[in-house]
């Protein structure tokens, strides 16, 4: 009797994947042959998410799913992962990208703005990791990639809440790496610098010039720069990389 060693078709859940970095990650994973669950935070964005998922399916021949879920809510995060597992039969990759900002100086920051950022960026990552890890442990395989930020590594004035949430993601990732490595599950954090997204589009020209002046590469990053790194960390080839924080910032943090 010949043992079946064929690699199963891999599937991925990408939170916050209807735009920006998350959208680029979903596209990159679909291009690499992963079935992809696209996520938006509420029903308002579901039509757009479904259209994006359908385009991925048509362009890359993979299976897709679009799910509206607020990852800050544990029940909705569980429902998101459960829906992907039911649709694809397994969940091999989780990319925690969903995140928000509520910037302001500490002395004037409202408690609700601090709580909202922590709830989505950190608690949301925890909720999805918990839901996915339970399934990954049973199948003895998994890749978890959590989006942190260079702000979580070095801090930034006016972003105490965001920096705290992204630093928390780093600590969570390292703890998960220690807990899950024996089950063939890796957990890594990607810490982007300034990437050309809706958030950076809101910057003034003067702010943009000041930021670019701090970057060795003298340009903002593209979402695709981040997506390619995530795709590698989500692959089987990255099986001996875990608990790491990889900055992708064009040399800004040198």
What are these regions (language model features)?
Residues 149:
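Residue(s) in the substrate-gating loop at a strand-loop-helix junction
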Residues 129, 165, 173:
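Active-site helix of classical SDR
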Residues 105-106, 110-118, 200, 211:
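Substrate-binding pocket helix/loop in short-chain dehydrogenase/reductase
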Residues 32-51:
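Conserved glycine-rich Rossmann-like NAD(P)H-binding loop of the short-chain dehydrogenase/reductase
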Residues 134, 178-182, 239:
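Alpha-helical segment proximal to the catalytic Tyr-Lys
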Residues 18-20:
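Conserved glycine-rich cofactor-binding loop
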Residues 88, 129, 137, 141, ...:
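C-terminal substrate-recognition "lid" of short-chain dehydrogenase/reductases
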């Amino acid at each position: 009797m010949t043992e079946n060693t064929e690699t199963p078709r891999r599937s991925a859940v990408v939170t916050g994947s209807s735009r920006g970095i998350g959208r680029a990650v979903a596209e990159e994973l679909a291009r690499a042959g992963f079935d992809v669950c696209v996520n938006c935070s509420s029903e308002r964005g579901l039509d757009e998410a479904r259209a994006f998922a359908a385009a991925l399916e048509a362009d890359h021949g993979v299976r897709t799913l679009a799910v509206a879920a607020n990852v800050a809510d544990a029940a909705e995060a569980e429902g998101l992962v459960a829906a992907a597992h039911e649709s694809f039969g397994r969940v091999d990759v989780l990319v925690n990208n969903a995140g928000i900002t509520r910037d302001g100086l500490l002395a004037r920051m409202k408690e609700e703005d601090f709580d909202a950022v922590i709830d989505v960026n950190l608690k949301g990552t925890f909720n999805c990791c918990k839901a996915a890890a339970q399934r990954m442990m049973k199948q003895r395989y998994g890749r978890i990639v959590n989006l942190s930020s260079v702000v979580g590594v070095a801090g930034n004035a006016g972003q105490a809440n965001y920096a705290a949430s992204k630093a928390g993601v780093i600590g969570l990732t390292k703890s998960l790496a220690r807990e899950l490595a024996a089950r063939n599950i890796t957990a890594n954090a990607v810490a982007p610098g300034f990437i050309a997204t809706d958030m950076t589009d809101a910057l003034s020209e003067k702010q943009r010039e000041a930021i670019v002046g701090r970057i060795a590469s003298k340009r903002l990053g593209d979402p695709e720069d981040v997506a390619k790194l995530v795709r590698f960390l989500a692959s089987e080839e990255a099986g001996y990389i875990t608990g790491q924080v990889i900055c992708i910032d064009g040399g800004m943090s040198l």
